């Protein structure tokens, strides 16, 4: 059985991604500290993650977000060998009104408040991104986990599936009708 969930949740996993104004410390992604203060924003982007063929995805994250900080999770998927645009699941913080973004459709991608769904297409990889924001240079949000679960699809090959190796037919004898003169 193929794995349909990926979780990035420790220093080793996070270090495979791209760090932009963020660093990894104590198994968490945090904003960079420059001259005694945290930078106002930063971004972590995972390496591309191959997945079994899928048509829907849910993003998960765990973060500590003190007052005046927020995080924003985003995802993109590979469809027909090309990456879709990034899809945001909104900014989240205890100090913000919590709600997912409204439904949006772009090409084959439908982004619902809690999931990404593909319309008549399938994806083969996922890439995760999370922005960290702070209005206070003394505090930073901390991301402990970033993950995704996909709904795998089973596609019938173009040539079809074999039902049985052999087609079992019983012999039937058909006689010709007799002609009357």
Task: Pin down the residues of each PLM region.
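Single conserved hydrophobic/aromatic residue that forms the stacking wall/gate
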Residues: 172-181
